[in-house]
């Protein structure tokens, strides 16, 4: 793993087609967007205080390889993964970043396919707060690091692979966001994923997005 931050962003700014899915809500209005096929959870502790659970919906019909990687790292089924790792980079009103379970500083991590794997596609965008995307060190360098958006960073579209959306636990995400950080955007208090895993999705459901 080459040195340097996995997520390359300007300092001033700080980074097979999935089937068209539509469904009708209780009002009868058809919802259009990607379908959640899988869910994972992160139980988070800040310092010595358990602050709650983040639940992330994943879009396996759009980015199946990226989702497979994320789920396997959440469950630890390959013998390594997110459990015990930290959110090592936090920038208020922008994003929180985690997933470096080897170096814990943004220079490490690995995928289930090897050290890195290529960008799958950029069909999903950074639509707003709570979207989950792969951190990288340039094109085709996805590993295990990811970030959760705290704004609508459209300048990252086409550069980072979006694969999920926070469905529950944004209060936990904001608790991490509000932590004091050092000069390298690292929280002064460890924000740890103390447990992680998969939640079964019996019936896929749509997350509505514009222009889908």
Curated annotation (Swiss-Prot):
Q: Name one Pfam family in it.
A: Pro_isomerase
Catalyzed reaction equations: [protein]-peptidylproline (omega=180) = [protein]-peptidylproline (omega=0)
Activity control, as annotated, is: Inhibited by cyclosporin A (CsA).
> Tissue-wise, where is it found?
Specifically expressed in kidney.
A single GO molecular-function term is: peptidyl-prolyl cis-trans isomerase activity
Where it sits in the cell: the answer is:
Cytoplasm
Give the EC number(s) under which this enzyme is classified. 5.2.1.8
Gene Ontology CC entries for this record: cytoplasm
Swiss-Prot/TrEMBL GO biological process terms: protein folding
Q: What Gene3D superfamilies is this protein classified in?
A: Cyclophilin-like
As for what it does, the entry says:
PPIase that catalyzes the cis-trans isomerization of proline imidic peptide bonds in oligopeptides and may therefore assist protein folding.
- Which named protein is this? Peptidyl-prolyl cis-trans isomerase C
What organism does the record attribute this protein to? Mus musculus (Mouse)
């Amino acid at each position: 793993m080459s040195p340097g931050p996995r997520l390359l962003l300007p300092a001033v700014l700080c980074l097979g087609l999935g089937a068209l899915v539509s469904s009708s809500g209780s009002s009868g209005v058809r919802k259009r967007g990607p379908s959640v096929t899988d869910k994972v959870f992160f139980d988070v502790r800040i310092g010595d205080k358990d602050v709650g659970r983040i639940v992330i919906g994943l879009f396996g019909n759009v980015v199946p390889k990226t989702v497979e990687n994320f789920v396997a790292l959440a469950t630890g089924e390959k013998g390594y993964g997110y459990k015990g790792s930290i959110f090592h980079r936090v920038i208020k009103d922008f994003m929180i970043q985690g997933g470096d379970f080897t170096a814990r500083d943004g220079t490490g991590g690995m995928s289930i396919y090897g050290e890195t794997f290529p960008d799958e596609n950029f069909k999903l965008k950074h639509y707003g707060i709570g979207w989950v995307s792969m951190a990288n060190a340039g094109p085709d360098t996805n590993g295990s690091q990811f970030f959760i958006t705290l704004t609508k960073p459209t300048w990252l579209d086409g550069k980072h692979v979006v694969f999920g959306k926070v469905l529950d636990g944004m209060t936990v995400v904001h608790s991490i966001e509000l932590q004091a950080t050092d000069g390298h955007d690292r929280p002064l208090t460890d924000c740890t994923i103390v447990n992680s895993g998969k939640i079964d999705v019996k019936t896929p459901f749509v997350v509505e997005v514009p222009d889908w």
